[in-house]
């Protein structure tokens, strides 16, 4: 997923996948799951080096309780593993070379709208609401929270800001779980805290970042046998692992090479995707029309896709080869961001998080 802001990654060696205990689809709460009990268990599971353990435990327990999620060790460790991978439990993590990245983004936007660089630099010399010029603030920016605030001020106060960015702040993720701000804004209903400002600003707080990050990780039903597929979905989008397995089945049935990225259709476009065209090639064997195929693929961002005739018939054909085709695989997506300086993939991210999850489960014993 190409974004101006992509989740942070910490270098570790890729480990082999281990079979997980428990079903990854079970996220409903149990009657005995009291907030105090969840907090107590979190204090046991949090890594030893985490500061303000009570604060982290309280915010995470609140998210589980208010969202009705099962606070099993599997689920709690999954949340802690993602948080450790993304920010090492820093509510406002520093990003290396963020000032340079920000200036490059501004220059890119200026070139795109044909605004001379010197005009942009002149506009950035204007004093911002905190008394410092935008240039000064950009030169010293260290975190995405700071950068988001700079862009908010620049867009609201300076005409040049709207020329370059419209009304859209280019910082797209934030907080200790590096959750998408657009996701948070779309899922703000039921947020248990009084919002002092905007949902964007809440994402950069520990309580908000954890609430929306946990919702993104566990707040949807999935029939995954292992949590690692949720970790991949956290990075690539809900149901990306399931959809990538569907794409692989289609590719093997047709001989057509497909990107196993989990994107089944071109959302927002009438043009058929490569996956849809490949499925159409199976139309006669599936006994389905092009329009019926498209309607089924449109459900690819929900659990309902698994109940469609298309899903069932494709896997029925795939299973006839003698070996049952997997219903979930790690998507083959290369991560792109100015913050990433080497080749990383969604599978790399998921495997990293899974390693941390396993270490957390050891602490649960």
Describe the residue ranges of each PLM region.
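Cell-wall glycan-active module
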Residues: 2-7, 22-365
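Bacterial N-terminal signal peptides
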Residues: 11-21
